[in-house]
Curated annotation (Swiss-Prot):
Residues 623-691 form the S1 motif domain. This is Polyribonucleotide nucleotidyltransferase. One of its GO terms (molecular function) is magnesium ion binding. Belongs to the polyribonucleotide nucleotidyltransferase family. It comes from Bacillus cereus (strain B4264). Residues 554-613 form the KH domain. Keywords: Cytoplasm, Magnesium, Metal-binding, Nucleotidyltransferase, RNA-binding, Transferase. Involved in mRNA degradation. Catalyzes the phosphorolysis of single-stranded polyribonucleotides processively in the 3'- to 5'-direction.
Amino acid sequence: MSQEKQVFSIDLAGRQLTVETGQLAKQANGAVLVRYGDTAVLSTATASKEAKNVDFFPLTVNYEERLYAVGKIPGGFIKREGRPSEKAILASRLIDRPIRPLFADGFRNEVQVVSIVMSVDQDCSSEMAAMLGSSLALSISDIPFEGPIAGATVGRINGEFVINPTVEQQEQSDIHLVVAGTKDAINMVEAGADQVPEETMLEAIMFGHDEIKRLIAFQEEIVQAVGKEKSEVKLYEVDADLNQAVREMAEEDMHSAIQVHEKHAREDAINEVKKRVIEHYEAQEVDADILGQVNEILYKIVKEEVRRLITVEKIRPDGRKGDEIRPLASEVGILSRTHGSGLFTRGQTQALSICTLGALGDVQILDGLGVEESKRFMHHYNFPSFSVGETRPMRGPGRREIGHGALGERALEPVIPSEKDFPYTVRLVSEVLESNGSTSQASICGSTLAMMDAGVPLKAPVAGIAMGLVKTGEHYTILSDIQGMEDHLGDMDFKVAGTAQGVTALQMDIKIDGLSREILEEALQQAKVGRVHILNHMLSVIPEPRTELSAYAPKIITMTINPDKIRDVIGPSGKQINKIIEETGVKIDIEQDGTVFISSINQEMNDKAKKIIEDIVREVQVGEIYEGKVKRVEKFGAFVELFSGKDGLVHISELALERVGKVEDVVKIGDVITVKVIEIDKQGRVNLSRKVLLKEEQEKEAAKEENKQEQQ
């Protein structure tokens, strides 16, 4: 292998993608700099020399954002990047998921893959550059990675699929799909869509896979040129004699324990068998390594039997058929002071979702590498330990919780009404109260119920379902509504959310090399049947969104003003708008186009604030008549307040029909008089007249008198 800098290029969606090796981060096992347009990502892969004493594969994937990549200095006192953003966490998960299945079973060396985003071109995805870079860093290293993999973003504009759409194209696209895989199969899908049919989503996935094959061929050329020879690594294996002895002792009882239908009773039965076997070996005073192997063998016995029951006998751990959904129960409005709430229960999985409506000023402000600056719809997911009957410290959300929250948000966002139709910020919080699999999809169902209870005029209700797969050779079984054991011991977790019309979100993780088109197609169609079944249940509880908002939700009124008048409403240093807020207790949000949103729980105060703003921006027209209060008296005339913030002058000569010697002879401060606008001068000063109206009144009276005399 050469240590000199080498450069490789390929065209990707009309923009050049370049890979540089041999110059940067040479002490890592593998490192590449990927340039895609003006986006630049450094990806590295390192591994420990010795295996770790753990019972899992210790892989860590980090996608690191640097604000210098978009020419920003971090805010706050410290002025450096802190904890990863939500976008960075989601990107890390996106890269981890297609990579993880491609390490040999039993590989226990610690592996860390790091991608640092160094420059960002918004039209050239840094996530896709990082995914390709991560795959390449592993592939050219001596780490025994069974890749490469590649990813592609797919959009659809006017019925045509587009690879790696630009920011402008994404705004027009009704599909936002990220697909990853090997040259032979798909092994990761992440998608949002605007109620798109399953057949179209499948076509989009396969369209993306065609591009993946091309990118993998490109990587294979690079590996051929600069790749290191793979290290010989000893994989974790259990002792053959010990394996046979444990199986003879445990298999029969374990097979019976696994067929207990109820989750906790089944777990207790399995743990009882495990306890008996482990106590047998502890009595022989064997070392920790032997006990570790015993636990590994017991785990494999459970896994093999669960998979055999599903694929051979077509029996699921809880006794259901392959396409059967667990019992459903739903309720809305169970929290009286919240704006909306929905409780969704599916078997032993339960989620309580709460909807809170806020003013547009409550949007989430985003400060990251993307073009999006704010977000008016949010979904947050919490998974407390009591939901699985365990204890652990209560800390902030982890990667999994952030990922599940984002999946729910993506599934629901296509049906959220526009800001014009529903000028509210919407925040959903899903509290998982019980967990036995598919909690992310339960949170989607609960959130739909909560929004309907809150009176959010959804375009359509959304439900979600998690599909599973157990595959042995060419034989496979697809499972609807998987529970925890099926997720843990199966080969696939394929989450599908959508309306009756089509898909709004997909997420697929697998533990095998990949899936064929046929399996994907069957899983999507089976998911549709299950989704419609769940939707029908939800609609039996609340058929449509409530027509009225909660009494505790803010009332919002919208008005439009001349954009040139915005500064008048705000006032110097915000003095005017703060005065309105202090006087009425409302929230006021003003858009650049002159749209004003006024919100509070008190409609009377909303109306009062609106009247004040109308008076501030109101334009005085010549010929208009006002009833105003005398605010100030001078020798030359009286100043009259026409409406809030607007005065005019009635010159002494315009106060009365007769000659006035002294202003105070006609009006005093505080008097309310009727005046007419007779002139607005070049400086915007308003001249008023009382005399004109008196004269007009006098003429009307004279005309009446004349008509009366003619009739006599």
